């Protein structure tokens, strides 16, 4: 997988309440919310806050059986994933599969309608990674 053209798109942070988290990120750090939406396929509410050329994504469980609810129950609030952009998501997925990487989903539309895939932490040295089509 080539990093050429890619960048760190966002850091996903699991929170119990986006509204409470915004008291810090917006009110204390001065970051503005550029997008707020519910991502039904992941059962989460999301808020994007630009930071330079990247973003912070605050993630709140929309349902008790969501991945974010389970993450918070097990680990508490905090860093959930690192998201990178790639110029060709399908080619990246094929390279990852050929190398034996464990993917958590096939490419699908998520926040902002962008195609994405998650890579299991067992394949990345312990970090949940998300790849997003540029």
Where are these regions (language model features)?
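N-terminal beta-strand motif that seeds the catalytic metal site of vicinal oxygen chelate
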Residues: 1-22, 77-86, 134
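Vicinal oxygen chelate
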Residues: 2-4, 47-48, 57, 84, ...
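A cross-kingdom feature marking solvent-exposed beta-strand/loop segments within repeated
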Residues: 3, 7-9, 31-44, 63-80, ...
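Hydrophobic aliphatic residue packing
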Residues: 13-15, 44, 68, 86-89, ...
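Short strand-coil-strand connectors
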Residues: 16, 50-52
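Short loop/beta submotifs within extracellular cysteine-rich repeat domains
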Residues: 21, 29-32, 55-56, 64-67, ...
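Conserved active-site tyrosine of GNAT-family acetyltransferases
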Residues: 21-26, 49, 96
């Amino acid at each position: 997988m080539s990093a050429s053209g890619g960048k760190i798109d966002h850091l996903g942070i699991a929170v119990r309440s986006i509204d409470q988290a915004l008291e810090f990120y917006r009110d204390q750090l001065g970051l503005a919310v550029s997008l707020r939406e519910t991502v039904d396929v992941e059962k989460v509410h999301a808020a994007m806050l630009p930071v330079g050329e990247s973003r912070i994504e605050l993630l709140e469980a929309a349902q008790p059986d969501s991945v974010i609810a389970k993450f918070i129950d097990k680990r508490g609030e905090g860093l959930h994933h690192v998201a990178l952009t790639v110029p060709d998501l399908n080619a990246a997925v094929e390279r990852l599969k050929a190398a034996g990487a464990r993917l958590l989903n096939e490419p699908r539309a998520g926040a902002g309608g962008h195609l994405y895939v998650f890579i299991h932490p067992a394949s990345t040295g312990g970090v949940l990674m998300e790849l997003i089509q540029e």
